[in-house]
């Protein structure tokens, strides 16, 4: 880890110098329309989420090691998180998030789907509560004028203000999704959509450990209606593993995102384009399929992929993320991404192409301002190389039914979140999954969920 920290230290200094050189300082004569409150010096916020799910029995003429169990089953996750922060000095903040998590997935293991049904299941490690460090990072802001906007206190955000034009640097232990791929309607599995394809791109194989976090940096440049983000993060030492690969100069995940705000029919919206590129020691499906053909048999582990992890390889993808308000209480969103699909999944899930479109409406429309209703349609696909591997009997990290009658995985999710007081919500959720793990011979699967969420 020392190599990572040394590298990050040099990156921090270099980017700080670049930002200061390129920055346009706020003019002393620039008018300030109001007096702004003193920035909040410290923060301590907490959240608790419990998510219980069950699915009924479904059609399944055959199963293998990584098939979703066709019998009636249930699962749960529980997390308690502290969001602690302090202002080190002007415009510099430090945040620390310890978390306790526990839970058990369907089938006793995280298998059988491309679009998994619970966004918190990667943090669960069984029935014993596990304490771990989720985040530890520094955020530095360089204000660039253009007027100011208020910042309300929130998780990992001290109350205060920021310039509309600014440069923001985040360095340390955090999630790529903390900075990249924002969306007002579909981002948080604790309060919004639960399915993995509902809160980020299903095909976004972003670098992270098995819990979804890593070490690295992200730089944001915000000016007027534009925002540009770039960053580099560490990935797992082995695909979908918990141990981090600290060689961030050799194995890494890079991302670049461009965002433009707009107004359509008098309502705000945003359009984003995100490109990512990962370098890691992973197997190509071509090599893994060749190994299967040379070593025929029935496998219960991703043996072929392990044997084919012979060299470093490049993974990449590009996606579009759009959101558009339809009024003060509702909005729609769209995400679409395509990955290259030539190599095994590195750190997220078994999806090479993803599409999600949805609608969210706030309860103020019917007199319950703290309620919300959401609907999303999702479609996941895999590459022809991954199809051939699975058809040959291959087992990957999350999926593998022994054979494959390929069809895109299709998912619809509907939730209603009922506000209980100001800071608690009870959410009822239904998901229907056709062609689970891209296999038309199995399913459909109906999943019913109840989620409890409180903030303190």
Explain the meaning of each model-derived region.
Residues 196-322, 329-332, 336-343, 350, ...:
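Signature for the C-terminal beta-barrel architecture of outer-membrane proteins
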Residues 135-147, 375, 444-456:
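Outer-membrane beta-barrel "beta-signal"
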Residues 48-54, 96-100, 169-173, 230-234, ...:
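Transmembrane beta-barrel strands of outer-membrane/channel proteins
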Residues 111-128, 132, 147-257, 393-404:
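Surface-exposed coil loops of outer-membrane beta-barrel proteins
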Residues 86-88, 98, 140-142, 173, ...:
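Residue-level signature of outer-membrane beta-barrel architecture
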Residues 42, 78-82, 132-138, 167, ...:
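Hydrophobic, lipid-facing positions within transmembrane beta-strands of outer-membrane proteins
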Residues 257-259, 274-312, 333, 340, ...:
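Outer membrane beta-barrel transmembrane domains
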Residues 32-42, 55-57, 85-94, 143-166, ...:
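Short loop/turn motifs that connect adjacent beta-strands in outer-membrane beta-barrel proteins
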């Amino acid at each position: 880890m020392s190599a990572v920290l040394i590298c990050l230290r040099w990156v921090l200094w270099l980017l700080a110098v670049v930002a200061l050189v390129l920055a346009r300082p706020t003019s002393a004569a620039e008018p300030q329309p109001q007096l702004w409150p003193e920035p909040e010096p410290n923060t301590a916020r907490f959240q608790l989420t419990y998510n219980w799910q069950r699915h009924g029995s479904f059609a399944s003429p055959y199963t293998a090691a990584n098939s979703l169990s066709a019998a009636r089953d249930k699962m749960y996750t529980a997390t308690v998180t502290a969001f602690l922060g302090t202002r080190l000095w002007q415009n510099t903040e430090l945040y620390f998030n310890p978390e306790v998590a526990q839970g058990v997935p369907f089938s006793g293991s995280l298998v059988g789907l491309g679009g998994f049904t619970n966004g918190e299941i990667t943090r669960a490690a069984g029935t014993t509560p596990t304490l771990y460090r989720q985040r530890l990072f520094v955020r530095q802001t360089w204000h660039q004028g253009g007027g100011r906007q208020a910042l309300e206190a929130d998780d990992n955000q001290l109350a205060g203000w920021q310039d509309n034009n600014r440069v923001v640097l985040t360095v340390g232990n955090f999630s790529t999704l903390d900075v990249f791929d924002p969306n007002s309607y579909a981002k948080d599995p604790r309060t919004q959509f639960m399915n993995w394809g509902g809160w980020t791109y299903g095909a976004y194989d972003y670098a992270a450990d098995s819990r979804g976090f890593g070490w690295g940096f992200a730089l944001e440049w915000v000016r007027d209606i534009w925002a540009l983000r770039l960053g580099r993060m560490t990935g797992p030492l082995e695909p979908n593993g918990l141990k981090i690969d600290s060689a961030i100069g050799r194995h890494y995940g890079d991302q670049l995102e461009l965002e433009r705000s707009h107004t359509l029919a008098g309502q705000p919206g945003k359009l984003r384009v995100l490109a990512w590129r990962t370098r890691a020691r992973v197997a190509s499906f071509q090599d893994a399929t060749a190994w299967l053909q040379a070593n025929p048999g029935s496998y219960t582990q991703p043996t072929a992929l392990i044997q084919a992890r012979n060299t470093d390889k490049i993974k990449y993808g590009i996606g579009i993320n759009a959101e558009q308000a339809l009024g003060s209480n509702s909005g729609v969103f769209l995400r679409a991404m395509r990955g290259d699909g030539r190599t095994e999944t590195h750190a997220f899930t078994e999806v090479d192409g993803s599409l999600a479109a949805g609608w969210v409406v706030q309860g103020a429309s019917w007199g319950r301002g703290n309620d919300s209703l959401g609907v999303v349609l999702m479609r996941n696909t895999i590459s022809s190389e991954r199809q051939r591997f699975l058809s040959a009997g291959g087992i990957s990290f999350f999926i593998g039914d022994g054979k494959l009658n390929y069809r895109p995985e299709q998912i619809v999710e509907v939730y209603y979140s009922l506000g209980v007081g100001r800071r608690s919500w009870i959410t009822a959720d239904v998901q229907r999954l056709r062609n689970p793990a891209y296999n038309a011979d199995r399913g459909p699967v109906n999943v019913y969920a109840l989620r409890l969420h409180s903030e303190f």
